[in-house]
Amino acid sequence: SARDFLRQECPTTHVRAMEEDLTGYSPELWQKMTELGWAGLMFPEQYGGSGYTFVELCVLLEEYGRSLLPSPFHATVLTFGLPILFGGSAAQKAHYLPAIAEGKHLGTLALTEPSASFEPSGVHVRAVAHNGGFVIDGTKLFVTNAHTADTLLVAVRSSDAGGPADGISLLLVPGNAPGVAQ
């Protein structure tokens, strides 16, 4: 069971050591967890996942919480992978989801800005179309696991049309892209 695995692999002393480490988690333990299928728990089988539901995800998260496990699961699976699953293109799903399920790709959501507002009106970072891509201008703060993420899912304001919840886009940005500072 998840509880038995975490009790054995993630004792309190191990958790404290991971918290002191600059990476913030154990890559070896993360790989074991992905081999158990946890990173792809909710992804469809066609993307290397198990095809389970939010119920199974919640059970697993309860056990994570019980063990105080520091890992890239929340950032990579919940705030990066699930938005791609539910809103990404077919090509994005095919590219990112199998790599996440296999433990070969880490991602995170860059949402918080200096205003610290989680409301749509708090998204001020701008994205302007340029040469087939976008130029992003602004600052994101408190981006969980940004220092280890291969890709950031960045919430930006791409249009001023409509109300404050309109004109917001999520852009995939390589973690090593020019201008990305961690």
Positions of predicted regions on the chain:
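Long, well-ordered alpha-helical segments
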Residues: 2-12, 88-95, 131-137, 170-180
